[in-house]
Amino acid sequence: AIIFDLGLSSFQLLDYTRGFSFKSKSKIDMNMGLASISAEYVLNNYSENNLKLILKLLGEESEAHKIVKNIIKARDVKKISTVSQLVEIIEKSKKKDYKKKINVCTKTFQALRIFVNKETSELINGITAATKFVKSGGKIIVISFHSIEDKIVKYYFTNYSKNKSNPSRYQPEEKKNEFIFFENYNKKIIKPSTDEIINNPPSRSAKLRFAIRNKNEFK
């Protein structure tokens, strides 16, 4: 089996120099080590439309328009370089909902981190490689922590599964099975128990999915 734990490392979060934490006073970098750009560069150089797309698609931020408008205004006056600057912009743009536990900055920070580190493409590349190397009967297990990751995993497992694929009825039988790499996929999500969440609060958003490899060769 191959297991993917897509959670952000606590060591990275606690390293305030990387700019992942809202509490950081450092530069807003968000680079995990391999990225060619920083969040600082994105915030100060990307167009208004591109910034809105990043926040909407990768952060699922419903108030992306307001936040980006204020980012543009702020950077026209002074370069956005620190986490505290971005936090201030977001807090001015969004009303705090005391009924929700999530910080108002969470979705924007998530979107920038995913974009800077190309996390979605890295996930796709990873599970594709795993499909190639896992033998028949082996499992590919993925623990995701937000809906974007989960949607990618669900789509991948479903699309290449025996019971979910819908090939054309006009294709020959061997072609119908050519791109089926998993046995009947059970789309049930495994979530952490109440005890796990109490002992490990960051696990509250975790979702585990797995698929069982069949004997078809991955070419």
Show which residues each predicted segment covers.
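S-adenosyl-L-methionine-dependent methyltransferase catalytic core, i.e., the SAM/SAH-binding region
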Residues: 1-219
